[in-house]
């Protein structure tokens, strides 16, 4: 029987085969006509790749069927080397969650029940209300805008 093999270039080859022929035999015939080694050939029929040991009858290939020939690609991308680090990884800072942390900014007077601020609020308009200044040993400092008040030094 006669089958057709269509190559990637669009060229169609006709082969004289029997339904009992193996895929290996078909690839050998393609090598005789085209010079492509069988290990580089991949034959596709009805969307399936044909395995070498099977026969044409296994795939229900009848007379005047068309097989598609594609070339096998070898290799792929180069393997990348794994990076080796000289120093150990830096530990990330963990945020310390303090429950009821707001209580350290205010004090409630027991006798009068009056609330007083323990920290100084930043007067800058950019910071807004509720932005407290850090209390250092010699100054008050706003971390948001950088405003600093230095205490009077007694000589």
From Swiss-Prot:
It comes from the Eukaryota. There is a cross-link at residue 76 (Glycyl lysine isopeptide (Gly-Lys) (interchain with K-? in acceptor proteins)). A zinc finger (C4-type) spans 122-145. The keyword Mitochondrion does not apply. Keywords: Cytoplasm, Isopeptide bond, Metal-binding, Nucleus, Ribonucleoprotein, Ribosomal protein, Ubl conjugation, Zinc, Zinc-finger. One of its GO terms (cellular component) is ribosome. The keyword Zinc applies. GO terms for biological process: translation. Disulfide bonds: none annotated. Residues 1-76 form the Ubiquitin-like domain. InterPro entries: Ribosomal_eS31, Ribosomal_eS31_euk-type_sf, Ribosomal_zn-bd, Ubiquitin-like_dom, Ubiquitin-like_domsf, Ubiquitin_CS, Ubiquitin_dom, Ubiquitin_ubiquitin-like. SUPFAM superfamilies: Ubiquitin-like, Zn-binding ribosomal proteins. One of its GO terms (molecular function) is zinc ion binding. PANTHER family: UBIQUITIN. Ubiquitin is generally synthesized as a polyubiquitin precursor with tandem head to tail repeats. Often, there are one to three additional amino acids after the last repeat, removed in the mature protein. Alternatively, ubiquitin extension protein is synthesized as a single copy of ubiquitin fused to a ribosomal protein (either eL40 or eS31) or to an ubiquitin-related protein (either RUB1 or RUB2). Following translation, extension protein is cleaved from ubiquitin. In the N-terminal section; belongs to the ubiquitin family. In the C-terminal section; belongs to the eukaryotic ribosomal protein eS31 family. This is Ubiquitin-ribosomal protein eS31y fusion protein. The lineage of its organism: Eukaryota, Viridiplantae, Streptophyta, Embryophyta, Tracheophyta.
């Amino acid at each position: 029987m006669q089958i057709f093999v269509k190559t990637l270039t669009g060229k169609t080859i006709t082969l004289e085969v029997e339904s009992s022929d193996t895929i290996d035999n078909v690839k050998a015939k393609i090598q005789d006509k085209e010079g492509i080694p069988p290990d580089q050939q991949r034959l596709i029929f009805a969307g399936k790749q044909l395995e070498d040991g099977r026969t044409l009858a296994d795939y229900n290939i009848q007379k005047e069927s068309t097989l598609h020939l594609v070339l096998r690609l070898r290799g792929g991308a180069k393997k990348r080397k794994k990076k080796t680090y000289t120093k150990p990884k830096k530990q990330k800072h963990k945020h310390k969650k303090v429950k009821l942390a707001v209580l350290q900014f205010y004090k409630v007077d027991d006798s009068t029940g009056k609330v007083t601020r323990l920290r100084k609020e930043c007067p800058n308009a950019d910071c807004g209300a509720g932005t407290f200044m850090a209390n250092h040993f010699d100054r008050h400092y706003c971390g948001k805008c950088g405003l600093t008040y230095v205490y009077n030094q007694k000589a």
